[in-house]
C-alpha cells in the first residue's frame, strides 16, 4: 500500500476492537524502538478505554482498501487537558482534538487523513505528543501544526508528564 491509496475514516465498532488493539501494540513497540518508551508505557491505551471510546462514538479507524491501518480518538473541545498551557494557543476558537493516534506502519498518511477529517468539522485542530516522539513532531510540523507550548497529562507509569502541544488553524 502507498500514499496514493484511498483512506476512508469511519467510526470504530466493536468488530474493530482486535485490530485497534493490534495497531496500538505495534505503535508502542515502534515508539519503544525509536527512543520513546514512556509516552504509552507498555499497555496504554488500555483495552477498557478503547471499548469505552467505541461505545461513546469517539474512536475512529482509517480504512485503506478494506484494511484498518490507523486508529484515533477525535472529539470537539474544550479538552480538560488543554485548559492550562505553558505557552499560548493560536486562538481560543472552537476546536477538535485528536488523541491516541496510531498507524499500522504499512501506509503513509494516516495522520494527514485524520486531520483532514477533523477539518471537515472545524477550522482548528489541537493535538499533543511526547517530547521523545520525534516521528510525530515531524509529521505534525509538515502538515502545518504550530508548536504552542507544553501541557501536562497524568500517566500512571510516569506520573505528571509533559507533552508538546500543537495547534493547526485554517
Q: Which residue ranges define each predicted feature?
A:
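Glycine-rich phosphate/pyrophosphate-binding loop shared by adenosine-nucleotide-utilizing enzymes
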Residues: 7, 66-71, 96
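A short beta-loop-alpha structural element at the N-terminal edge
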Residues: 8-22
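Conserved beta-strand in the GNAT
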Residues: 61, 67-77
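Conserved acyl-donor/pantetheine-binding loop and adjacent beta-alpha core of acyl/acetyltransferases
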Residues: 73-106, 157-158
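Conserved GNAT acetyl-CoA-binding A-motif
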Residues: 120-132
